[in-house]
């Protein structure tokens, strides 16, 4: 009679070495390893990938760890085993130990990597390389479009059978057309990643419906083509911690902390990434803490960066819908950099589109706190702050960047700046404090400055066109608004200055017009501005060889007293002491101007005539003229007029 084992024997081991050396495991065995890295195992003779954490090779077969939920780094005997475990998709690993990286850790689709308070990854001691990779790949085969696809379209066409696209497939479109987000494309060509939502074929042509509209025109004349990339999808990194302060005197170099390429739905939160740069030193090896290249729907939240050679978060290629929230970057080149790819080693495609930075902070950056490098579209920063940057606080080098309620403190150059050829950044409710050159510099291509404040700079706003509306400016040593061009070939455009509070506070002029750079004041309009206290000296001019025509002026205030009242005409005339002012000379670097006096008749006697202002006179007392003794005459066309007339003085 055959004997049948009814109860599997229990095999308990106190250490890993004795367990993996045991020679007599059988399939039914119940196997237990004691200790912090212990657990329950099953034995199998089926070939399995060994990672020395969840799968061990033993005599005659393999031990498989029994677990539900994440694996733990403390289970693994070495870094190579962790790399092996994470090389497959659908993985969840908790880093609960200090790991010494000896190679790149590649993370695949549908995976999560999270760190406990004691979990760390220390960069490779021997080779400077990336630490964590979420890397897909570009298509290996492209097919041409069957027809032009216009910007705004959500449909492309290819020849029937040319592309094996089905619902859910990612597509990578590109052409030889150049990116258009900024003034200098550096030769980078257009590209986008889209997802297929439907496919239909008729008459030898396959129509592919896309999840989002195209941002560019894809023309056959520009060799527009499409392929299927390999995307890494749905990856989450929770509290990633790379390197340590003072670890081996910060000599553990890495090129990129977390590198993503052709990835979708990548989310990084609450991390710490420490670079190798000595405090305050210039750029060194170690480009970026986090790099997104050709990624879609990515987020970074609550992550800190220290001593990074270049960038905290770098976004380039056709990355789209990237959001960065609540990061803190200390002693990096830029906290956030939207970048172009170098074409020195061949063609490159794609610019960042739809980028949003919210509640981000940059401290002591070696260059601008936040930068957009020449290309990119629909870029926005909200409630971000730059402190003590060695260049500008914020630098816009692509068109139409929008800043909402951001702040710049003590930048070595401008608090907020654009660059050559950049058109019309938008600033709303932003604050600039104690920046060396200016609070806002829009003098490279114009800009819009709405309800902002600048205090303690040489100039509050440098600008050559656009609009400055609302806001408050104080303690700016030369001027509150400097109308100039930082580059001679930049075209001056019309400029509206409206409703700005720029009272005299002991330093600087309200406005400065830079004739040296060819500024034409007639392209400027100034209205409803509070320039109280500046008096005759509200404007500074330089570089003009003949007296220029002043800007268009309306309802500006130079004083807060002696500027309104009521006069009663006697025999059709009244002399009024008021703070009327004017400059009647013809000196080149000055404007010829006189106060505007608005008259409103309050009574209407039968003798009422047409009212005019004549004989504006300024007190000439020496050494200090008294503006309260300035005067003007209200005169009626009817010498019998005895009307009461309200008067208001403006510039």
UniProtKB/Swiss-Prot annotation:
Enzyme Commission numbers on file = 4.-.-.-
One GO term in the molecular function aspect is: lyase activity
Where's it found, cell-wise?
Virion
Residue ranges for the region (Interaction with the host trisaccharides on the capsule) are: 71-559
- Site-annotated residues for Important for catalysis: 311, 373, 397
Q: An example Gene Ontology cellular component term from the record? A: virus tail
Major subcellular location class: virion
Q: Which domain of life is it from?
A: Viruses
A Gene Ontology annotation in the biological process aspect, one of them, is: adhesion receptor-mediated virion attachment to host cell
Q: What positions are marked as the site Substrate binding 2?
A: 217, 378
Site (Substrate binding 1): residue numbering on this chain: 130, 291, 314, 339-340, 373
Q: Give residue numbers for the site Substrate binding 2 and important for the adsorption and infectivity of phage.
A: 472
Q: Which Pfam families match?
A: K1-lyase_C (PF24146), K1-lyase_N (PF24145), K1-lyase_Rider (PF24149)
List the keywords (alphabetical).
Degradation of host capsule during virus entry, Degradation of host cell envelope components during virus entry, Host-virus interaction, Lyase, Viral attachment to host adhesion receptor, Viral attachment to host cell, Viral tail protein, Virion, Virus entry into host cell
- Subunit structure of this entry? Homotrimer.
**Protein family per UniProt:** Belongs to the K1-specific depolymerase family.
Function description: Functions as a receptor binding protein (RBP) and mediates the attachment to the host capsular exopolysaccharides. Displays a lyase activity that specifically degrades the K1-type polysaccharides of Klebsiella pneumoniae capsule.
Instruction: State the protein's name.
Output: Depolymerase, capsule K1-specific
């Amino acid at each position: 009679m055959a004997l049948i084992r009814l109860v599997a024997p229990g095999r308990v081991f106190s250490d890993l070495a004795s367990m993996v050396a045991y020679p007599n495991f059988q399939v039914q065995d119940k196997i237990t390893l004691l200790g912090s890295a212990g657990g329950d195992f099953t034995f199998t003779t089926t070939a399995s990938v060994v990672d020395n954490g969840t799968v061990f090779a033993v005599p005659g077969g393999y031990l498989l760890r029994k677990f539900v939920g994440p694996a733990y780094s403390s289970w693994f005997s070495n870094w190579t085993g962790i790399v092996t475990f994470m090389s497959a998709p659908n993985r969840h690993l908790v880093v609960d130990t200090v790991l010494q990286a000896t190679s790149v850790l590649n993370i695949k689709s549908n995976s999560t990597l999270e760190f406990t308070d004691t979990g760390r990854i220390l960069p490779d001691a021997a080779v400077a390389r990336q630490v964590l990779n979420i890397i897909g790949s570009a298509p290996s085969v492209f097919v041409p479009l069957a027809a032009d696809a216009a910007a705004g379209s959500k449909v492309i066409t290819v020849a029937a059978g040319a592309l094996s696209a089905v619902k859910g497939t990612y597509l990578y479109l590109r052409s030889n057309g150049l990116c258009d987000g900024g003034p200098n494309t550096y030769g980078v060509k257009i590209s986008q990643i889209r997802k297929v939502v439907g496919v239909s074929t008729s008459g030898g042509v396959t129509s592919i419906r896309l999840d989002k509209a195209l941002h560019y025109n894809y023309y056959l004349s520009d060799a527009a083509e499409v392929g299927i990339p390999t995307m890494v999808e749905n990856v989450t990194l929770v509290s990633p911690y790379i390197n340590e302060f003072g670890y081996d005197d910060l000599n553990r170099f890495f090129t990129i902390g977390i590198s993503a390429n052709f990835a979708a739905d990548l989310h990084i939160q609450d991390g710490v990434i420490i670079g190798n740069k000595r405090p305050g030193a210039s750029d060194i090896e170690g480009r970026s803490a986090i790099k997104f290249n050709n990624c879609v729907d990515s987020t970074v939240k609550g992550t800190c960066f220290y001593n990074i050679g270049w960038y905290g978060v770098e976004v380039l290629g056709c990355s789209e819908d990237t959001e960065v929230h609540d990061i803190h970057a200390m002693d990096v080149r830029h906290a956030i950099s939207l970048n172009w790819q170098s074409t020195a080693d061949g063609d490159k495609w794609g610019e960042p589109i739809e980028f949003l930075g919210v509640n981000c902070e940059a401290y002591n950056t070696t260059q601008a706190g936040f930068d957009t490098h020449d290309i990119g579209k629909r870029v926005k920063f909200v409630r971000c702050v730059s402190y003590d940057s060695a260049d500008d606080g914020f630098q816009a080098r692509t068109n139409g960047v929008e800043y909402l309620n951001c702040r710049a403190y003590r930048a070595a150059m401008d608090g907020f700046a654009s660059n050559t050829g950049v058109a019309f950044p938008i600033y709303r409710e932003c604050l600039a404090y104690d920046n060396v050159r200016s609070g806002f510099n829009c003098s490279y291509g114009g800009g819009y400055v709405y309800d902002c404040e600048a205090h303690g700079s040489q100039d509050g706003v440098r600008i050559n066109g656009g609009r400055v509306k609302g806001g408050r400016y104080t303690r700016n040593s030369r001027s509150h608004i400097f109308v100039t061009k930082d580059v001679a070939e930049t075209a001056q455009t019309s400029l509206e200055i409206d409703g700005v509070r720029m009272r005299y506070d002991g330093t600087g002029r309200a406005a400065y017009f830079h004739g040296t750079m060819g500024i034409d004041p007639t392209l400027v309009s100034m209205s409803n501005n509070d320039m109280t206290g500046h008096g005759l000296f509200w404007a500074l001019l330089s570089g003009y060889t003949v007296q220029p025509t002043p800007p268009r002026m309306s309802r500006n205030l130079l004083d807060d007293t002696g500027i309104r009242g009521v006069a009663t005409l006697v025999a059709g005339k009244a002399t009024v002491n008021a703070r009327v002012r004017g400059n009647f000379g013809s000196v080149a670097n000055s404007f010829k101007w006189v106060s505007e006096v608005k008259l409103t008749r309050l009574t209407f006697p039968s003798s009422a005539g047409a009212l005019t202002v004549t004989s504006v006179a300024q007190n000439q007392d020496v050494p200090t003229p008294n503006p309260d003794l300035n005067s003007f005459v209200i005169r009626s066309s009817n010498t019998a007029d005895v009307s009461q007339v309200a008067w208001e003085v403006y510039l």
